[in-house]
Regions:
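Hydrophobic, aromatic-rich cap/lid helix
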Residues: 63-91
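Flexible "cap/lid" loop of the alpha/beta hydrolase fold
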Residues: 12-20, 25-56
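Short alpha-helix in the alpha/beta-hydrolase fold that links the catalytic acid
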Residues: 98, 112-121
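Catalytic histidine neighborhood in serine/cysteine hydrolases
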Residues: 120-137
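Catalytic histidine-centered segment of alpha/beta-hydrolase-like enzymes
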Residues: 134-147
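Alpha/beta-hydrolase fold nucleophile elbow
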Residues: 1-9
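Generic structural signal for small/hydrophobic residues in well-ordered secondary structure
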Residues: 32, 84, 102-105, 146
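Short beta-strand/loop motif that positions the catalytic acidic residue
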Residues: 95-96, 102-104, 108
Length: 156
């Protein structure tokens, strides 16, 4: 049997893999998993529009904008990265058949709690654990607690 433990972007990969039906997965652990379409503020849309305008006027200046991950990519990879991180995996999450443990830090800003709740609602055979005093790197911030839940889940 195959068990998968993933975090953040790895959660995207795990959701796609688990929902594909191509590999039989016994148990899946999603920790601060990405993949649910984020709620975007008006300010976010303003920044995207500003970036698109600057990109047309000054591509050099636009290249200095964005997240650190984005800035380090080659021009060819930037569009691929944007497509991947903007793909909503909500429909895929509904197709996951395996037992799934979803762990999120209560203070996660990168993948907020509403995403965890949506995954839990969509994945029929899932359990949701929200850990206090932890953010996106819950597995580092509350290592012993995460280890306990993951161990109990995998050994059950």
């Amino acid at each position: 049997s195959l068990n998968i433990i993933s975090h953040s972007f790895g959660g995207r990969v795990a959701i796609l893999l688990a929902s594909s039906g191509e590999i039989e997965i016994d148990k899946l652990v999603l920790i601060g998993a990405a993949g649910i379409k984020p709620k975007r503020s008006l300010y976010y849309h303003y920044k995207v529009l500003k970036y698109k305008i600057i990109k047309k006027i000054s591509p050099e200046k636009a290249a200095k904008m964005g997240s650190n991950d984005y800035k380090q990519l080659s021009m060819g990879m930037k569009s691929t990265f944007s497509n991947i991180v903007n793909t909503d995996l909500t429909p895929n999450s509904k197709l996951i058949p395996c037992k799934t443990l979803i762990i999120y830090g209560k203070n996660d800003k990168e993948t907020p709690i509403y995403m965890a709740k949506k995954l839990h609602k969509n994945i029929k055979n899932s359990k949701l654990i929200i850990i206090k005093k932890a953010g996106h790197f819950v597995y580092l911030e509350q290592f012993n607690i995460v280890l306990k839940y993951v161990s109990l889940f995998l050994n059950s």
